[in-house]
Amino acid sequence: VVRQVGLPGTNTGAREGDSYGIDTGLPTGKNPVKVSFPIFLWPKAVIDAKSMTSKNAAVRGADHLSHNIKFIWNTQGNTLINQHGGINQLRKILEDDKLVETIVVVDNQMTPSAKFADYVLPDTMNQEIDELEGDAYAVGDYNYLIACPKAADILWDQRPNFEIMREMAKRFGVEDKYTEGRTY
């Protein structure tokens, strides 16, 4: 905008570079669903998914989406309402049971997204579980893990996300495949 890109002390407005040399996630296995689209287009996929194509909506794995989203599982994100423009339009979409039939939110706070959920599953807070914290998004080339032992016991009925998903896998008959013999 001010023609300063590339001059000393300036940049493009993007965040500084970072490299993610440590992958702290669990293996994901093979996903039988091959079709995907950018997450921030989920409202369009709820209302009119069939109009979303590889050319106009970056659909991958197919030329277009074949059906509207009817079920949303939102984990620790609060992305249903506060990460998008047009909050009033999103509210109407989320409140219409004919559009999204079921919304599940997993979080440790009653976020704006959780207020639209049919089911809220209580997650733990970082201080209640042993964790390995990985590289943050803005620390440059310093790849590391920090051991974070729990500082407090889990209160009430919260469960770590791994345990929530283990229970779901158990109910679908794939618990052993999900856990691969591991426990949390």
What are these regions (language model features)?
Residues 1, 9-184:
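Non-catalytic alpha/beta scaffold blocks inside enzyme catalytic domains
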Residues 4:
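Short, solvent-exposed turn/loop segments enriched in Gly/Ser/Thr/Pro and often Arg
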